[in-house]
């Protein structure tokens, strides 16, 4: 057993031990966090008696304490820069570049080398290299593809009918025998309801059976696709993957229905690519040249590189030049925002290139030869797809190989003619002729090694095989039969499963069961060690089975002249091509929305769907196969294992800021979280001022209609977001409902991006144009906002009234407390006028409309603060923090701290007692009045100063988690990781008591069919929260009992089982 295997096995055991330790301490951690005790995860108790019992806490989810001077340790009005993944702006190079005339003459003048001229090199290349290659490729046997069904455009979950009852009602109404004591309080269900529920159960069972059958059918088709590739007559080996047009390693790359195949980035349709592109030798000066710089250099620390020695100068392959027909946008990002699973990055550098070095026809032939004929990237196409079929056009980007040499601060670069001559020199003949094979077989071993050393790690090509191109690691010979073979050391494809995997899985399951029996009984099972040894042997065999050594005859193989360093440049060129075309599309998009981004990184992020995890610019399997078959060889098992980020402990650590480092979140869900608040405020603002006589209930109804996904999806399509959204090429967004939901989220993310880039005003303009751009009259009504009625009466302010009106004079003291002076002090008075106050000419009504508006303002400013200051938090984490900050409890504390109760304008003969909800409404109404009088910036300063310092309390005490969420996380922590549908807490209504104006709801919480606790309250939500708190207290006591049992010795463990079980 080698050292690598020992190291890997020890590392695997280390991760298994870490996972087991985390699982063992999880419930103890949850109990500690529930009661806000200091961490005990660093060291375990030394004895059972040292484990602390939980303290009795009546209510752990209380309001935050009042603010002190220590809470203002930082300036909450100053934000860090918005975290993005890459820096922007293009780089311009100042290198002195000239054409390598000597190299061109050397390659073409000598008849022994190429035997052509600069005028005839393209013709000779096509006739002596391309034509024979395509003729040989046509000799391959055409095996029909496996016919896979297209993805369905219907929704995976059928829409509910309006009269169809929710499944939760069935869960809540169905009760066990333990609920009999409350059975008299619940009315008996009619027969029609029972029939509907039985029908629903039958339909659900049929749907589950259909899903199982569909999954089995898909697995069968996948296996058939894999077997087809394994048994292909032209495959060089059953365990080596190869590329075919439109096909991945196991199934077709695109299974989209025909109606949607002519749209979207995933099908190669880029916005704005609807013009015929033509360039010729005479137009070369109007083209734009950008060097694709790949870091780290692919040939760094490598012996074998793509290079050629000419007249004492060493020309090496530097990468590719990307030639475009228009200059790249000035605000274009250096690199794309999305991720790709390749260990390289690239930058586009604007650089001068001699016009005589570029010829469009030469470059098109070189591109076809490298990308399609050698590496078989058959789905990679640079021609615009919006043009009618048969329309002749240049590709959107010309990709030119760069061979350079440096001398005296001057860079000499090959022309496209010289590159053609290079490939003609290597590709016109086979790598070894029969005479060469016979000569090499007659050599001594030392001479043979020196002869073929220069061919080591060459990329060789045989167009009659699949894959056509391979990396030749070494060459061997059969002296008896006078034959030569190329050797490649590789790894079998993961699609071709090892026969040892089922046996390994069965043994691991059996060992896990024996380990649990040993833990329970304390007796060692004699079969355990035998199974462990057998498992080690099987894993060694599995490892050996993954490794593969190919030995192929050299007949019909040609040397392309390329080495594995070219592979990384090719992969980066594909991604860079998408990046360039996408940024040209963004320029069209900016014209549509009539807004130019200062930083395009934010709009790129806003248009990346969460399914878009990694992208290669073409079929992912094609790029992976190219890297595996032709790239530098990687050691098997050398990849780093990343720690999983899921789990309740990780959640608490993230929320508490205890994570070190972290990767940026490269999709639009964080922006969608912020954009939801932006869109809500825009809609609230317009409705508030347009419908100035509508009550808050009607305004809320209209706002719901405006911000619903159906409407936002239409606005997204009006902005052509459907042409710009980047998402995975699969079945996720095929059906119409999910597609519209994704468009709505993308529109909200776009609003957030514009808000972060320039503020709320451009967001308002884009929303207005998207909503009513096709109806000028309606757009005029939407854009024309009336002033508030109190401001209309006194356009210059009404502070003079406070001198003669005692009711207004009292608010001067409040202005001194908060440090803000209102222009219209009657607005401030209206914010403190409750609903039960009769209508009067002073305030013109109560504060409910202002409270409705202030809620939207508060949501946006808190969301903006969390987005900017917690860049590594997901949208779910930020939602938890926002909920804790804008809750009624927090707002009631703010109301008490600022003394708002003293200034409430109440009705005559009414008590001044305010409930928690009343105090919260008072704060929101004040924010609404401040927004109407002073604008968003004053609200931002007030909310950042009053609310945001309290966030530290919620983070440190971990009270951002309510009881129901906490109980759900507890149940998830003890789930079986192999179960895709873990059990969740169920809340059931046991009974309703009392008159209609004073109802008491009794609720019980169940887990895995057992009741955990019950509680009663005046509404369902509060009753569920109390039931969850009671369940947590009971579960915590039980968890500490189990932890004590864990630290017992074997004898103590058995005695405990005997006496206490």
From Swiss-Prot:
PROSITE patterns, A to Z: DS_RBD, RNASE_3_1, RNASE_3_2
Span of domain DRBM: 962-1037
GO BP: any one term: cell differentiation
GO molecular function annotation: metal ion binding; ribonuclease III activity; RNA binding
Top-level taxon in the UniProt lineage: Eukaryota
Cofactor: Mg(2+); Mn(2+)
Residues marked Important for activity (site): 917
Keywords in alphabetical order: Developmental protein, Differentiation, Endonuclease, Gonadal differentiation, Hydrolase, Magnesium, Manganese, Metal-binding, Nuclease, Nucleus, Repeat, Ribosome biogenesis, RNA-binding, rRNA processing
Location in or out of the cell: Nucleus
Record-stated family: Belongs to the ribonuclease III family.
Protein name: Ribonuclease 3
